[in-house]
Regions:
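Membrane-embedded transmembrane alpha-helical bundles that form the catalytic cores
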Residues: 3-7, 11-334
Length: 335
């Protein structure tokens, strides 16, 4: 019995201290991780290749796209929104939407990749969230491990959808309100969470009125319109998430609404062409078909070991050449 307790203690300690997911996710459940500890560790060629691909893509997202557009554009706009026109503020918001995605998902990709190299499987944590045609779909694709944790431990504990429609909508708002508060004791985080909660409740209400089934996908122009609306709502909420205080958020919104000045865009593009080139690349990669990513991943898996090593060396060289400052801390480290 003592030996069994010692083994359980070692197993549990290993689970809570497993470094790839320790600081910023993905949130790995004990029921998914502990059974893997009991099995003999084995790293297949596919696991090794997929791990290298994920580390490569995560480092590319974080060190090349996220850090560069943050240091050279996004931080300047958000630090002093009143110094810039509405079009500059809007581009800053678009930049932050890409920055935070590349930062969060880049860390998750690297964590999942490192775990694969060590013989462990983590679940997917980001699934092209800006492709979402509704706010409900967005939360099925964004930080999936956090979304499922909030659902299992807050939403369902509050009653979920078991106590009528009104209670379901209220539970969604309360869950997201608490999710916002978890990020920090700030009105901006509270508003960010509450806005998402209200949007989720309104979408559930709309689905109930129109008779649409859970998980039913829209198609064609209807889906394109849904993606555009959802993306801009999420960007609106990012304004509150990113800004240090409520006044800065209101200043930014005021600039976008009252002093847009679109005629400045050509000058903006000329002055920040490297930033906009990276933003365009980032969004193109994000909205590319999933089959393209799968094809590239399969190609990496088939590469010999020397090819995989050379790929990482080239990426590290590009990171060194492009960085304009020290590598920035991951955004999620502050939460």
């Amino acid at each position: 019995a003592i030996r069994r307790q010692r083994q359980m203690c070692i197993r549990d300690s290993f689970y809570v201290s497993f470094f790839p997911q320790l600081v910023a996710g993905p949130i790995v459940r004990a029921r998914d991780f502990i059974p893997q500890i009991r099995k003999p560790l084995f790293v297949s060629q596919e696991m090794f290749g997929r791990g290298i691909f994920l580390i490569f893509s995560g480092l590319f997202k974080k060190a090349i796209i996220s850090d560069y557009i943050s240091v050279n554009f996004v931080e300047r706009i958000f630090d002093n929104p009143t110094l810039y026109s509405g079009v500059e503020n809007l581009m800053g918001v678009y930049g932050y939407a890409l920055q935070i995605y590349c930062d969060f998902s880049g860390y998750s990709d690297m964590a999942i990749g490192i775990a694969l190299l060590l013989g462990f499987h983590f679940n997917l944590n980001f699934n092209s969230p800006y492709k979402s045609a509704s706010i409900t779909e967005f939360w099925r694709r964004w930080h999936i491990s956090l979304s499922s944790w909030l659902k299992d431990y807050l939403y369902i504990s509050l009653g979920g959808n078991r106590k009528g429609k009104f209670r379901q909508y209220l539970n969604l708002i309360i869950t997201m309100f608490l999710g916002g508060l978890w990020h920090g004791a700030s009105w901006n985080f509270v508003l960010w969470g509450t806005f998402h909660g209200i949007a989720l409740a309104l979408h559930k209400m709309w689905m109930s009125i129109t008779g649409r089934k859970k998980g039913e996908q829209s198609h064609g122009w209807r889906r394109v319109f849904g993606v555009i609306i959802t993306f801009h709502f999420v960007c609106f909420c990012w304004i509150f998430f990113r800004n240090a205080d409520f006044q800065n958020s209101m200043d930014m919104l005021k600039q976008i609404v009252t002093t847009f000045r679109p005629q400045l865009f050509p000058q903006l593009l000329e002055g920040y062409w490297k930033v906009f080139a990276l933003m365009l690349l980032g969004f193109l990669l994000h909205f590319a078909p999933d089959s393209w990513e799968d094809a590239v991943c399969r190609g990496v898996i088939r590469l010999p070991f020397v090819g995989k090593a050379l790929m990482l060396v080239v990426l590290i060289y590009v990171v060194i050449q492009m960085k304009s400052s020290e590598i920035q801390p991951f955004i999620y480290f502050q939460f």
